[in-house]
């Protein structure tokens, strides 16, 4: 084999390995965490967050979430090898060794903590580590294989990114930060359970007691509906009593929440209809993205609108 051929082969192997490492981190899951983090930062900073702090916090959040997801893949590699949708992942497929996953996770966690501690503050760095600990210790290790409430309690890990973002900007956690935490916490079950309904056969095969497996479709649909009912008033707490966003955001939150409730109600009418569960799962993602966009838009646009109206009023005097 010529030198160029060996070089080409090595480059190809490295490229494949990097792709496997990225797959370990579940990048599609991370995007939504970053959106909620950025929204929390803009609300906390009232639309005046420095681009440097925003980029560092989002980069650190990416590393922290990637570390947690990598450890999750490592721990679950036995059941991933059995489940149809996960058996081709790098660890169960044998493309990545367990020690590589451990090394990658530790490196990512250290990077996340170091960046936040150095360029934001210690509180945000510790919160990021707490997110990893809750996801790995509470959800993955303790609850996922033992309780149908696994995603409810363990879902607290997914609600920590807004706390990290808020703390990075302010150095503290106000009531508004905890409302953001509560919003993600309440949103997680009606987001995840429709997906669990779609793949419940896989969960049953590996004896993971997700609610659709243990309680059935009807009970799951009813629980989803109850959580969506609780989500709308929770999202409005940012308007009152917290007062960190205006009723411009509130109108969007009511509209999105009403449609979410309607979609969830539709599922209760036909719990076994998989297409309704699929549509609800997809809408839950869109709901959170648009809600965060409404927060950011409210904080970025409202001050300029107020200034413009004041200037217009001065001209008309």
UniProtKB/Swiss-Prot annotation:
Q: Its encoding gene is what?
A: ctaB
Matching entries from NCBIfam families are given as:
cyoE_ctaB (TIGR01473), PRK04375.1-2 (NF003349)
Mind telling me what this protein is named?
A: Protoheme IX farnesyltransferase
Kindly list the places in or outside the cell where this protein is found, as annotated in its UniProt entry. Answer: Cell inner membrane
Q: What class of enzyme is it?
A: transferase
Misc note: Carbon 2 of the heme B porphyrin ring is defined according to the Fischer nomenclature.
Task: Assign the protein's first listed, main location to one coarse class.
Answer: membrane
- Identify the keywords attached in UniProt to this record, alphabetized: Cell inner membrane, Cell membrane, Heme biosynthesis, Membrane, Transferase, Transmembrane, Transmembrane helix
Q: Which organism is it from?
A: Thermosynechococcus vestitus (strain NIES-2133 / IAM M-273 / BP-1)
The molecular function terms of the Gene Ontology recorded here are: protoheme IX farnesyltransferase activity
Q: In which pathway does it act?
A: Porphyrin-containing compound metabolism; heme O biosynthesis; heme O from protoheme: step 1/1
